[in-house]
Design a protein with these regions (language model features):
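Phosphate-binding loop that captures ATP/GTP phosphates
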Residues: 85-141
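Conserved nucleotide-binding/hydrolysis micro-motifs of P-loop NTPases
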Residues: 96-99, 148-151, 199-200, 232-236, ...
Length: 313
């Protein structure tokens, strides 16, 4: 992270989607329009969203619109928030190796990696066996480390096997994906969270990311995306508003995360929710609540089952 800017805003903000995405779901619309900051009623609604049951499993891919956007820490805090408030088992996969990698931001309980999990997937018959490959944070979030070179060592079949294996034990899977593997993991995404920095680069980065998604057949996934502007301060408000102007009407919701120096890499592996400032925690609660609101959309892999159940009634 760059040096902290002065005077961060005191509260997070949730921006509503464009008119074309405001159909149905009155509760979700109110949720997105709510602004955090001492509003216990809004916080309660976020928590209620997180606790709503849903059918099957959900896969959330977290993507950075540009380098240094805060993709990894956003995925980590989103995972912590789900684990703390949802009550369902949550796992995050580190597929974005480097000095600031997901696994480096959490305490390590195992030397196993995603590669090892895939190699021995047929031997994982219980949650106890599964836990040999994960490290668990205090929030309850489990993290699978990337290994030395997952970008070249794993192919499409490997990722498919990993997802199938995790679906047996976890209700929510988050994938922190490097740019080199985005094309391999997006086919498994039920939702995407797009992260842009609160900087002058953000408007162009958001526009290019949307264009890439549309150009590669992910327009529908893009319309249901949640776009996060990360590291917001008063100094960056002009850049933030320009980025939001690009995204508004083209994604489901926009969420601002305020600057918080507790998220810096030199605080790792103590990047836990309790270490954050209250407005930052509230912003991540809002983000998780908005993402959870998208769980009402039944993934295509379950739609045939649902239709059969409805036909048998």
């Amino acid at each position: 992270m760059p040096p902290p800017p002065p005077a961060p805003p005191s509260e997070p903000a949730i921006t509503p989607p464009g008119p074309e995405h405001q159909h149905g779901g009155g509760g979700l619309r109110r949720l997105i329009q709510a602004v955090g900051g001492g509003h216990s009623e809004a916080d309660a609604e976020y928590q209620q969203r997180l606790q709503q049951p849903f059918q099957g499993t959900r896969h959330i891919v977290v993507l950075g619109c540009t380098g240094g956007a805060g993709q990894t820490v956003t995925g980590l805090m989103l995972g912590h928030t789900f684990a703390q408030h949802n009550g369902e088992p949550v796992v995050a996969i580190d597929i974005n190796p480097g000095p600031g990698a997901l696994a480096r931001r959490t305490r390590s309980e195992t030397n196993e990696t995603l590669t090892g999990l895939i190699t021995r997937a047929d031997q994982i018959g219980s949650l106890t066996a599964m836990r040999r490959y994960t490290s668990q944070a205090k929030s309850g979030l489990e993290v699978i480390a990337a290994g030395k070179n997952p970008l070249q060592a794993l192919d499409d079949r490997d990722y498919a096997l990993a997802i199938r294996t995790l679906d047996r034990f976890y209700s929510i899977t988050l994938l922190d994906a490097a740019a080199a593997v985005v094309a391999r993991v997006l086919p498994y995404a039920d939702q995407i969270v797009l992260v842009a920095p609160a900087s002058a680069d953000a408007p162009r980065a958001v526009a290019m990311t949307f264009e890439w998604l549309d150009g590669h057949g992910y327009e529908e996934l893009r319309t249901r995306a949640v776009t996060v502007i990360n590291g917001v301060s008063r100094r960056s408000m002009d850049d933030v508003e320009q980025a939001e102007a690009v995204a508004r009407g083209r994604c489901r919701a926009l969420v601002r995360i305020p600057w918080d120096d507790h998220l810096s890499m030199d605080r790792a592996p103590r990047n836990e929710l309790k270490s954050l400032r209250a407005p930052t925690r509230r912003a991540y609660l809002a983000l998780a609540g908005v993402v959870a609101g998208g769980f009402t959309v039944i993934p295509e892999r379950y739609q045939d089952v649902q239709q059969e159940q409805e036909a048998s009634r």
